[in-house]
Amino acid sequence: MKRIVFLLLLLPIITHARAENFRFAQLSDIHLSPKSTHALEDLKRSIDEIAADTSIAFVIASGDLTEAGDRRCLELLKNELDRLPMPYFVTSGNHETTWSESACTAFDKVFGSSRFAFSWQDCFFIGFNSGPFLKMMDGHVAPQDIEWLKSTLDSLKRVAPDTKIFPVTHYPLQDGDVDNWYDVTDVLRLYNIQAILGGHYHRNLLYSADGIPNVLGRSNLHGKDSVGGYTIIAISPDSIRWSEKVIGKTAVQWLALPFGPKAYPEAVAERPSFAVNETYPEVEERWQKKSGVAILEAPALGKTALFYGDDNGTFYALDRMTGQTVWMYQTGSRIKSAPAVYDGRVVFGSTDGNIYCLSENNGKLLWKVGTGDVVMGCPVISEIAGTLAVLIGGSDHVFRAIELKTGREIWRYTGVDGYVVTRPCVYMGKVIFGAWDCGLYALNLKDGTRAWRWSNGSANDKFSPATVWPVATHGRVFIVAPDRVFTCIDAASGRTIYRTKEHKVRESIGLSADGTTIFSRCMWDTIIAMDARSPKPLTIWKTDGEYGYDHNPSMMIEKDGVIIFGTKNGLLHGVAAKDMRYRGIKVEAGTVLWRHKIGNSVLNTICPVSAYECYVTSTDGSVTHIVINE
């Protein structure tokens, strides 16, 4: 790969040079896929044409370069980009980060990083990932990436304050696209930003990112046309010009903006509202810890500590009462695995390829099992023939049962077609889990042999019941999935009992404490309760949750009669699971008891203590202890 990255120490020489005309190409939304040759053909044509154009100084590729972030396609992409005689720079898009068997680690291994920063004449280009992270959510810029952005631009400003800056993301930095857009624009507004470059919408668009021009370029795909294309951006001493370049045709300019000193003294876009917290003053944030690093999964509760892992691969134990760090353990890569705690031991997977078991008391490593691939699966601990066992799947297409005490493998199942990220369900002598292959698996707990495999029949693996945590009761297994179907399956045979699209569900589900009711959440406001015993779909109640559009896979956890869940934009809910008394008041099932906005980013599946207390982690890097005062 041919790249030029200028060190900040050289910036005074570079940026004080006289600005001259230069042009560069922007490739976006290439969507290479092993299932289609069209995207590769479109890319080859663009690479051939760009390589032959000696006026192009460099190339920027702004995300969705592959369909699913798989290593094979990333390496194929790199091979094509390496044919360019000029340097190129890449960042990732939502198709690299949402559906990634490698937990986004393959991108960094192939390209070095999803970040880049370099100078060209008196301009500075800085690219970074804009999410989402390994599940359905809005785009999100990780807190550690925001800190890197600020640090890099601060260093640049000290040595070359007049440099013209071009941030590069995939998503536009605006409400509805990136949940914490304002955290990013509050940083960018302090500098001489000319325009933010991006893609995502597959067409030429000009947006305002809190007053900063945010320009999106076309997709490289040909779509309904015979050939694809790309964007050419020309910089001159007084203007920036965007042209669409269709393969074999003359470039057509579609936008021009002035080039020169820029200032954005005030925010112009409306910030998220936290007014809902005034409606429910009884909800208290007893403590909150902000780590500055994204947290991608649910925490787990021990005797005196709360446990979770973060995007930097650090595993934490926090004091439950104070939020102070009790101990930390460093793994080799990001953690996207909700831990399990039992008998003084805490178990989790890491994307460094290992399954870890640590002492609950002091974080000492008791054992680890290497898998040879990323582990995003969430473990459960269950008994197999009198032995406590850890049950967990990974990206090596293997599901394992491991002795909790020793780390000895009890059995393994190697027939999983997709990768596993879910927390499995143990029921009727089986361990049940979904994978990113449209399948739901039931393995015999005693020996790991397959009892059955259920499929939704789709050819699109993005409809898989992979993220949902299955629930089971009354001889049935219940799932919801991105196909927006509520499904009931016979636990003994894997036979479909019913599937219904009556409610537009997605990936959030839960089971009542008495096993009679299944809870789920729709993509628009509605919370539902379904009868777990009925031979056909039967809605017991439904209620308006007033959360708007939401596809966050936060499971519907009931504790002491209260369902607690969080949304993609930081809104925590408490809902009555049944007719009950709460805070001394008689309420009906489905009543929204309280709501509380913690931030504007994804809340992971909640860790409840009681109907009045829970712990919440978020992709914004926060851990919050919530108490509802009686």
Go through the PLM ranges and name each one.
Residues Y280-A300, W327-Y342, W367-A385, S395, ...:
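Extracytoplasmic beta-rich repeat domains
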Residues E49-V59, M137-P213:
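His/acidic metal-ligating clusters that form di-metal
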Residues I598-E630:
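Blade-level signature of beta-propeller repeat domains, shared across WD40, Kelch, NHL, RCC1
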Residues A25-K44, T66-A68, E96-V110, P132-Q144, ...:
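Acidic/histidine-rich helix-loop elements
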Residues I212-V276:
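Binuclear metal-dependent phosphoesterase catalytic core
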Residues I13-L76:
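N-terminal active-site segment of His-dependent metallophosphoesterases
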Residues T37, S62-D82, T97-K109, G176-V184, ...:
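Metal-dependent catalytic neighborhoods of phosphoester/phosphodiester hydrolases
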Residues D319-G323, S359-N362, E403-G407, N444-G448, ...:
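Short loop/turn segments that connect beta-strands within beta-propeller blades
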